[in-house]
């Protein structure tokens, strides 16, 4: 893995976040380089530039170095990306005083003069981002989108025009292209969150645009729901919660428990919180109700936008961690997220606490869990998925 970013006279040392990742993964790709090269070659300048989907800060750091007095509005849905930006700015001794941090649900400011963005893997989310931009960008604003050349096709360009304005792609460079879009000034309405019913659980689930499994239960979650651990648990973490379906069902299985929903995606956390409230699950049982009517009832759900369990309050000692680990980080296929989840779960579980996870068979999670917990049991399996359990 190289950490030396060099493009159009800009030199940086960049790391993924967390930095202890597989040596074959780096913190930027050729599309980042192409965007920087295109911007400098065409001498486009702006006093206020919005940056969207910058994986670990290559664009943010490059523009901070090249245009130190310009205002940057940097938006991300991923906590690890935000932490990566801050890590790389600090490492390269770049000031962040000109940067305003935005999450993926905040109202965009009206003063944006230029937009740089990477094409995300989730095209539904991409369409929503473009529609959000249309609500604030005046006609004539330029949007530059970096992407792999193989990802660009007439349907994508038509989608950009539908959601924001006419678009065209540059010549290929290092197997990437830069899409240039000019805002047409028309405000689009934003799509509503997708909702559906899980009849067997009597739950209604709603997903914001960047949440995995947009309109149905994924297969891994379904087998997990059918195989929740036996026993009574008081403090449960739904790690990598997505829309919160596992944590919601945990409340049904263990009605007196406190549930902590944790995810790297801000939209996932917002979806999980909405689903908890929409299904009216925050109704404490008699055991959790205060004897004093003047005292606020103890909440049963807590929501954490976090890099695994890195910033979970120190007083949270779970006796159960349930987890459906992702094996993608953006475009990269990697097992470091699952590894970090298992390590963090082992650190935070109380003695005798249980890790209960579902994963694809081919990922061989049992090997990793055994290394950390010194035990691992197969609870259930089918042709594709396996449910594993380990005790601290």
Swiss-Prot record:
Gene3D superfamilies: Vaccinia Virus protein VP39. Its EC number is 2.1.1.174. It is an enzyme of class 2 (transferase). The keyword S-adenosyl-L-methionine applies. GO terms for molecular function: 23S rRNA (guanine(1835)-N(2))-methyltransferase activity; nucleic acid binding. SUPFAM superfamilies: S-adenosyl-L-methionine-dependent methyltransferases (SSF53335). GO terms for cellular component: cytoplasm. InterPro entries: DNA_methylase_N6_adenine_CS (IPR002052), rRNA_m2G-MeTrfase_RlmG (IPR017237), RsmC/RlmG (IPR046977), SAM-dependent_MTases_sf (IPR029063), Small_mtfrase_dom (IPR007848). Keywords: Cytoplasm, Methyltransferase, rRNA processing, S-adenosyl-L-methionine, Transferase. It is found in: Cytoplasm. Its main location: cytoplasm. Pfam families: MTS (PF05175). It catalyses: guanosine(1835) in 23S rRNA + S-adenosyl-L-methionine = N(2)-methylguanosine(1835) in 23S rRNA + S-adenosyl-L-homocysteine + H(+). HAMAP family: 23SrRNA_methyltr_G. Specifically methylates the guanine in position 1835 (m2G1835) of 23S rRNA. Belongs to the methyltransferase superfamily. RlmG family. This is Ribosomal RNA large subunit methyltransferase G.
């Amino acid at each position: 893995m190289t950490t030396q970013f060099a493009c159009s006279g800009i030199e940086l040392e960049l790391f993924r976040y967390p930095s202890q990742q597989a040596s074959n993964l780096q913190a930027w790709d050729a599309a980042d380089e192409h965007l920087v090269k295109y911007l400098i070659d065409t001498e486009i300048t702006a006093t206020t530039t919005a940056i969207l989907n910058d994986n670990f800060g290559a664009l943010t750091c490059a523009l901070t170095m090249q245009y130190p007095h310009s205002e940057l509005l940097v938006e991300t849905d991923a906590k690890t990306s935000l932490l990566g930006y801050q890590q790389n700015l600090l490492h390269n001794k770049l000031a962040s005083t000109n940067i305003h941090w935005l999450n993926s649900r905040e109202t965009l400011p009206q003063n944006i003069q230029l937009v740089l963005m990477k094409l995300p893997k989730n095209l539904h989310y991409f369409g929503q981002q473009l529609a959000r931009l249309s609500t604030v960008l005046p006609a004539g604003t330029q949007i530059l989108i970096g992407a792999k050349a193989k990802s660009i096709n007439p349907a994508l360009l038509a989608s950009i025009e539908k959601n924001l304005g006419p678009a065209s792609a540059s010549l290929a460079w290092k197997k990437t292209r830069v899409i240039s879009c000019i805002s047409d000034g028309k405000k689009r309405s934003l799509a509503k969150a997708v909702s559906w019913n899980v009849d067997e659980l009597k739950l209604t689930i709603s997903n914001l645009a960047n949440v995995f499994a947009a309109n149905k239960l994924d297969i891994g979650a379904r087998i997990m729901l059918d195989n929740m651990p036996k026993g009574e648990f008081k403090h449960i973490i739904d790690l990598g919660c997505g829309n919160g379906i596992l944590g919601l069902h945990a409340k049904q299985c263990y009605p007196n428990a406190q549930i902590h929903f944790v995810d790297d995606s801000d939209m996932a956390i917002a979806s999980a919180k909405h689903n908890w409230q929409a299904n009216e699950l925050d109704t404490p049982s008699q055991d959790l109700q205060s004897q004093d009517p003047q005292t606020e009832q103890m909440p049963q759900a807590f929501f954490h936008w976090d890099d695994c369990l890195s910033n979970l309050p120190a007083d949270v000692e779970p006796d159960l961690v349930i987890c459906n680990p992702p094996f993608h980080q953006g475009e990269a296929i990697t097992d470091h997220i699952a590894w970090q989840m298992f390590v963090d779960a082992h650190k935070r579980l109380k003695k005798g606490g249980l890790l209960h996870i579902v994963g694809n068979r081919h990922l061989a999670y049992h090997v990793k869990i055994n290394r950390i917990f010194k035990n691992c049991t197969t609870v259930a399996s089918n042709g594709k998925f396996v449910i594993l359990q380990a005790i601290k």
